[in-house]
Amino acid sequence: MNILVVKTPEELAEAGYKLIKEVVKSKENPTLGMATGSSPLGIYAEMRKNKLDTSHATTVNLDEYVNLPHEDKNSYHYFMQEQLFDHLPFKQTYVPNGMASDLEEECKRYEGILVANPVDLQILGIGENGHIGFNEPGTPFNSPTNIVELTESTRQANLRFFENEEDVPTHAITMGIGSIMKAKQILLVAMGSKKAEAIKELLQGEYSEACPATVLQRHPNVTVIADPEALSLCSEAIADEHRQVFTISDLLSDSRVGETAN
C-alpha cells in the first residue's frame, strides 16, 4: 500500500489528478470508479481546469441515495453533472438509479455494468467509522452492489448538505465491498483529524468487517493520499516512515515510497 503525504488540499488534488491522468492516458478504454462528497472535489476541479481528455473513458459511480430525484441538488446524479459531466466529455457514464421502481433489480443491473466495465482506477473517500462507499461496519467483504440503510452517524455527517435532518435520505444503493475490490487500482483520499481513527485502522488495524476499509489491506494496488492530521494517530513506526511529502512522480515511476507492509 503506497502512502503519499500531502500538506494541503491543493497538493492532494494535484496528486490525485496526476494519478487519474496517468490511467486515462495509458488506457485505450479506461473505466474510472467515481466517488462523491467533499473528498474528491479538488481532484475533479483539476480535471476541469486541465481539460483532461476523457472522451474515451467510462465512469461508474460508487453510490446514490434512494428516492432522491436525479435533479435534486443533493443527488449524486446532480453532483456528477455539476462537477464533471457538464464540463468534460465521457464515452459513457453510469450512476445507480435510486429512483428505480425495483431496487433489487437495479442492484443486479448495476452489478452487471461493473462486470462489463472492469474498473481501472477506483476513487474512494473514507468515513469516520471506516466505511467505504456506503458500506457500513459489519458489511460482508464479499458483498455485491446492494441497498443499505444509512447509519445515524453517516446521516449526521451528510446533514450539512441538506436543509433539514428529515431531508437526509435513509437508504442508498452502493457498490458492495466485493465490487470495489475488483478494481485494478484504488485511490483513497483523506484529510483532517476526523479521519485519523479510520486511517489508523486502515494502516495498522485488524483485517475485520468491523472496519470496512481494512479490506484494502488485501488489495494489491492501493494508493492513500493523506495529510499529517489524517495520519496523526498512526504508530510512531508508521509516522516515522510516512510523515514526509513524497511526489506523485515517485508513485508513477513504480517507486516503493511509502509502501506499508501488510
UniProtKB/Swiss-Prot annotation:
Keyword Hydrolase recorded: yes
CC terms in the record's Gene Ontology section: cytoplasm
BP-aspect Gene Ontology terms: carbohydrate metabolic process; glucosamine catabolic process; N-acetylglucosamine catabolic process; N-acetylneuraminate catabolic process
CDD domains: GlcN6P_deaminase
Active-site annotation: 63, 129, 131, 136
Any one GO molecular-function label of the UniProt entry: glucosamine-6-phosphate deaminase activity
Reactions catalysed: alpha-D-glucosamine 6-phosphate + H2O = beta-D-fructose 6-phosphate + NH4(+)
Keyword Magnesium: no
Pfam families to which the protein is assigned, alphabetical: Glucosamine_iso
Keywords assigned by UniProt, alphabetized: Carbohydrate metabolism, Hydrolase
Family: Belongs to the glucosamine/galactosamine-6-phosphate isomerase family. NagB subfamily.
Name of this chain's protein: Glucosamine-6-phosphate deaminase
Organism, as annotated: Bacillus mycoides (strain KBAB4)
Lineage: Bacteria, Bacillati, Bacillota, Bacilli, Bacillales
Gene behind this protein: nagB
